[in-house]
Amino acid sequence: MTIEFDSLFGDIGVDRFLAEYWQRKPLLIRQAIPGFESQIETNELAGLSLEEEVESRIILKEGSHPWELRQGPFPDDTYQQLPERDWTLLVQAVDQFVPEVADLLAQFRFLPSWRVDDIMISYATPGGGVGPHYDNYDVFLLQGHGKRRWRIGQQCSEDSPLLENPDLRILAEFDCQDEWVLEPGDMLYIPPGVAHDGVAETDCMTYSIGFRAPSHAEILVHFTDYLAHHLSDDQRYGDAGVNRPSDPAAIDPAAIDRLQQSVLRLVSDKEALATWFGRHMTEAKYPELAQAYACLLYTSPSPRD
């Protein structure tokens, strides 16, 4: 399946999308991929969730408590024991297991490849979803089969109130601003921080193409770790020409200035930053899966009797 980037966004086109929508506001694209058919069967997706190497979750709207989270891998009889509705299965990094799913990433090469995270696929029974929430990254939601109703809400932050839930970050307040039902081939773009809530109207499958957005904390921690690994133990704090302190128990401003200059000099090495960033952002999210794929056998339990 090959399409031009512009056709993915209909009349808007990729350039206008990047200028007006990317990281700014949601966009619904009807028939972004006309005639799209899911690249994986429901039973295959369920089979992946049984494997030790695969990150998977099941969320029940009404389980042992509201919005119960269950972590995979799951036993073989899991899907025979679930209710008829109001639950969803989520499987991460399906693109690392199924080449046909990975091929979808070619449609998003109008953005740098290092920004791509993975393709998560969710299967939901009627009423199933993960609750109203927001993400800190960009995501395209491509409908694989069935119908899902999406509500778009307010801009959120870490200060947005959440429900009391031990495992999930579900918004306590949701200000619905738009609402659409997506069918196969339809796609919804959600920028970071925008509240959204998807509920299955029929048995359905949704492809979530997520994009990496490293936090400043992640950048600082990993880059300084990289720098530290390449520094000689002989490179140390120095204070030649230091003046006699007025208070020996105090750390004087001059010491802080020298320390700051040392840190700034180290982190200002653009060549080192580029080398680290290239390695960090092109590392597979689940490097162990590359080997696991070669020996993984799909199991195909029926989601329900």
Outline where the language-model segments fall.
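Conserved small/polar residues in nucleotide/adenosyl-binding loops
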Residues: 298-305
